[in-house]
Amino acid sequence: MRMNRLHVTAALLLPLLFTAAVPDDVQRFEIDRTHSRVGFAVRHMGVATVRGEFRDFEGHLLLNTADITKSTVSIVIRTATIDTGNERRDNHLRSADFFNAEQYPTITFETRRVEQGAEGYVLVGDLTIRDVAKEVHIPFELNGPITLDGRQRLGAEGSVQVNRKDFKLMWNNMGEGVNVVSDDVRIELAIEAATPR
């Protein structure tokens, strides 16, 4: 009988423990992929800019409404879904010369912290490409949240420039000093996210 009472007590306490672990001022927002974009821009031959995006990605934001700098962001991007509007080029980007999508199917971003910036905020976190993690600082603008159809929605936009060679994206078929593809790549994020249904 004593054992049964212990089991009942534990069953009643567990939900309370889990509830206490998530503060009331933290809200979970899931990325709405149909209203979001994860893109990039890079110079080609030094004379033109090629733009592209990844079609498949997911992630979430844990928004601390009391202190935004305590919020966290997690994003997973599937490299095989890269799209620059040119099938031949996209296949090359999926190959071992660049993202090697078969061996490295995802790119990830995980925040370390959020800082107050001069205008808006700065995401500081680890960007991982081809199993190479580098700390990046992404200035971003946060809009919202608003309430629509019983759910809260917010938007965030930001960009950051990275050196592709830091992530072992080394391909260049014209030798040293002449880049078919610039070393510098601008990553562009336009995210809309909503609370779960």
Stretches with model-predicted labels:
Residues 9-17:
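Bacterial N-terminal signal peptides
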